[in-house]
Amino acid sequence: MAKQNTHLEHLEDDILNQGSRGGFNAIKFLNELGVMLSEPRSSMRVTTKWDGAPAIICGKHPETGDFFVGTKGVFAKLPKICMNDGDVDVLYSGELANKLKDCLKYLSKLPIKGVLQGDLLYTNDKVIRKVGDQQSITFQPNTITYAVPKDTDLGKKIAKSKLGIVFHTSYSGGPELRDMIPSFGVDVSKMQNVPGVTVFSSDFNVKDATMFTPQDMTRYKSAIKKAEGSLKQASKFLDILKTSGEGKFMLAPMFKIYFNTYIRQGKTFPSADAVTRGFTDFYTQALDKEIALKKQESTKKKYIKMKEDGLKFIKQNSKPIYMTVASYMNLTAAKTIVIRQLERVKGIGTYIRTDNGFRVTAPEGFVAIRSGNALKLVDRLEFSRANFTVEKNWG
């Protein structure tokens, strides 16, 4: 069964998800992105990652041919599929239910073949406000606020529409929804003249991007070489890491949670050495918290032993853990060079809402697609931190 596009992973997280294979994959992606930004022969595709919510899956049901909508729950073992308002009332509630009813009403008008996945951008929650020195139509589906000048062609189109969505993934095959095969990228050119709906494209036109200068390319190749060097030393340990630990205290997922604590707190990584030392404290605190929750003495002993074994493993593998942290940081550094280059392309205005008004920000990020596989390119400190703190408009 194919894996649906329910969650894309960050490029640097691939070493924690797939071990040494993930490191090899991340380097392949980075090298191909370098080709894409320096010469016209790249097979790499890039899409813009819109900060829409909720995720919407819709189209013709592969078994019945009837139009349906739903969230990512359509791929569950007990799929939550809505073919009419009654289904929505049974399966959903609140503002999400209202938005899904709008999706049924308006997306069913689109010439959709098969099944598409996208992100909802707005329904009845558009707001006209002054952003900078222009009156703009704004919508905030999740963390980022999008702003389009009111008097432009796109602004007028959005003003007339009842719903806005961006599609990024198509599905084909069957016989059931969960058996369908995803393909990244959707041609939305034939969906542009349907009354009441504005369909945005996620495609990123690389021709609009500023190419790397020779100096840029030298700096970028140096960043990749640095990542390759640390990965070479971390490679064997990354494969051990995937199978180390027990239950929710498997070490690879714990490293992901640990790295994310820096982002939640709005902190950049200090040195690789400091991050490595900090993981011991993080692991200790997580196990101590779990031990304190246990009532039975036998269960407490189990987790006390797990903690002791884990700390012993961490101490014995301090150097490979250091190289793992260094690899993560080096991959992030190389990825950031690409992000900054892609961000130079001007698109729809993107802002973060603050207590003092709106602050200009970059798009959420990009998705790099290579040989049917996709990884996220996101400035996590900028976007993900805001994602944890900015109040959302739907629930």
Residue ranges and their predicted role:
Residues 2-44, 49-54, 58-395:
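Core nucleotide-handling region used for phosphoryl-transfer chemistry
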